[in-house]
Amino acid sequence: MNLVVIGVNHKTAPVALRERLAFVGGDIQVAQAQLQQITAGSLIISTCNRTEIYALAPSTQLLANSDAALSKQSDLSLADEPVSTVDLTEQLITWLADFKQVPLEETRPYLYDYVDGQALTHMLRVAAGLDSMILGEPQIFGQIKRSVNQAKEQGFLTNQLNWVVEQIFAAAKRVRNETDVGTQAISLGYAASKLVTQIFDRPEETTFLLIAAGEMNRLVAQNIAGLGVKRILICNRTPERANLLAQELAHLGIQIEVHPLTELDSLLYQADIVSSCSGSMDMLIDKAMTRRALKKRRYKPMLMVDLAVPRDIDSSVGKLDDVYLYSIDDLQHVIAGNLEKRRQAAVEAELLVSHLVVEIERRFQVRKVGQDIHDYRALAAQKAEAVLNEALHELRTSEATAEEVMTELTRRLTQTLVHAPSSLMRRAARDGNNEAIDLIILGLKDAYRKK
């Protein structure tokens, strides 16, 4: 297959090095253009937790002079021999260090590299969330898809690498659909969003009230906003941070309002979902306030998530009918149980990954043989045409009879047809490979028998 991957991730490299090796902005386009010169297709995946380069080694390799291997200004020449995956791996490692201007000796100890089946396995594990910091998280799949789409738009994803990527995407979906590795919530934000879908049949019709615009509530907001809620109310002591969060969520096309914390009492009745994490020493929502809100909203159910320590919402609020109150401890208990379930599911997922990689390799071999047969037929037709042209020329210019020319044509075509298998059998005989000789002879006999 000639597939190579090199990279660093959160398990192999400290964040300081990952930052230096990350691709941002227009970096990827420039990098992909350079990689085109030494690969048969490449793909760069760069997130906060990993930087990886996937590439195919070409059968005929463009090489540059040794002191500027990938410079566009270098004089390029065709190599006589195919480039091995070992050679390409070394080229990619050297290129990455040069491109990011990080000394090779500082980079190499933290890099991992895989080829062919191991590279496929790694790529599938990454896409399925099995290699993520948060086991089974789905975000990496979307990040890879965006990288693939970008490479396609820029013309850097070759047909062969695109085929590999499509196989990986289909396999990753099977891993997530056929195992429970991604079904259990193991982050506070994701756990909160799961509660929303359990309580509300139509999250897109709900209003979400966010009390405080700190980091934890920001993560909750991202997850719940991703459900497509109709409206978000951000209630914060100061408008600056609330406005920043509003801008961050604005691209989702959701109606967003920013209010001062002093308006909380008058806003509460509008909220179907409440997430609070203020860091205040005072209780923000008590039982009486919630009763007023419930009455005003005609006792439609409310989900309240209190992530604050000390708590923002009086625990007695949870005793009210139509209120579902969850504290940070409640969510942590859910997450702990779910993490163990994910770990158990990951064992099953890893077995499925191994099976799917074998399937992909088999499909690749079938695809490759099909291309090899096509190329062989084209070469045979080219040789036959050359022999035919010689015969036609002889008919026009020599005194030979048509029968003599046809006899010579038949002889030459026969030599052309038997040359390749004869050479293979001689080579196999020299190598003592009797199995290959038997396979060739039996195959030829079977083919001629069918004719």
From Swiss-Prot:
InterPro entries per UniProt: 4pyrrol_synth_GluRdtase, 4pyrrol_synth_GluRdtase_dimer, 4pyrrol_synth_GluRdtase_N, GluRdtase_dimer_dom_sf, GluRdtase_N_sf, NAD(P)-bd_dom_sf, Shikm_DH/Glu-tRNA_Rdtase
Domain observations: Possesses an unusual extended V-shaped dimeric structure with each monomer consisting of three distinct domains arranged along a curved 'spinal' alpha-helix. The N-terminal catalytic domain specifically recognizes the glutamate moiety of the substrate. The second domain is the NADPH-binding domain, and the third C-terminal domain is responsible for dimerization.
Miscellaneous remark of the record: During catalysis, the active site Cys acts as a nucleophile attacking the alpha-carbonyl group of tRNA-bound glutamate with the formation of a thioester intermediate between enzyme and glutamate, and the concomitant release of tRNA(Glu). The thioester intermediate is finally reduced by direct hydride transfer from NADPH, to form the product GSA.
Pathway entry: Porphyrin-containing compound metabolism; protoporphyrin-IX biosynthesis; 5-aminolevulinate from L-glutamyl-tRNA(Glu): step 1/2
Enzyme Commission code(s) on record: 1.2.1.70
Pfam families: GlutR_dimer (PF00745), GlutR_N (PF05201), Shikimate_DH (PF01488)
Broad class of enzyme this protein falls into: oxidoreductase
Highest taxon in the source lineage: Bacteria
PANTHER family cross-referenced by the UniProt entry: GLUTAMYL-TRNA REDUCTASE
Matching HAMAP family: Glu_tRNA_reductase
Protein name, entry field: Glutamyl-tRNA reductase
Cytoplasm listed as a keyword: no
Reaction equation(s) it catalyzes: (S)-4-amino-5-oxopentanoate + tRNA(Glu) + NADP(+) = L-glutamyl-tRNA(Glu) + NADPH + H(+)
Role played: Catalyzes the NADPH-dependent reduction of glutamyl-tRNA(Glu) to glutamate 1-semialdehyde (GSA).
Site feature (Important for activity) residues: H122
Active site: C48 (nucleophile)
Biological source species: Psychrobacter sp. (strain PRwf-1)
UniProt binding sites for NADP(+): A212, A213, G214, E215, M216, N217
Family annotation (NCBIfam families): hemA (TIGR01035)
GO biological process: protoporphyrinogen IX biosynthetic process from glutamate
